[in-house]
Amino acid sequence: MKINVTGRHIHITEALQLYIENKFKKIEKHFANVIDIHVILTVEKIRMEAEATLKINKGNIFANSEKEDMYMAIDELVDK
């Protein structure tokens, strides 16, 4: 499973990259056939948004989350 992370108005640090990778590894337990995950993190003033597109054998799954803290947005995104 390949995880791509893109930042819009945010620098993706190594710690943030590792946090995302560890969170999305849990998804493999629920979806054994995940091919690719693309995560986009966006910062606009005080709005933090995390969105992800999972490519699986039978199509795509999309989810997004907005919070005041990026780590909280990522947590909620994975929980969806």
Predicted regions and their residues:
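N-terminal, polar/charged subdomain of small-to-medium soluble alpha/beta proteins
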Residues: 1-80
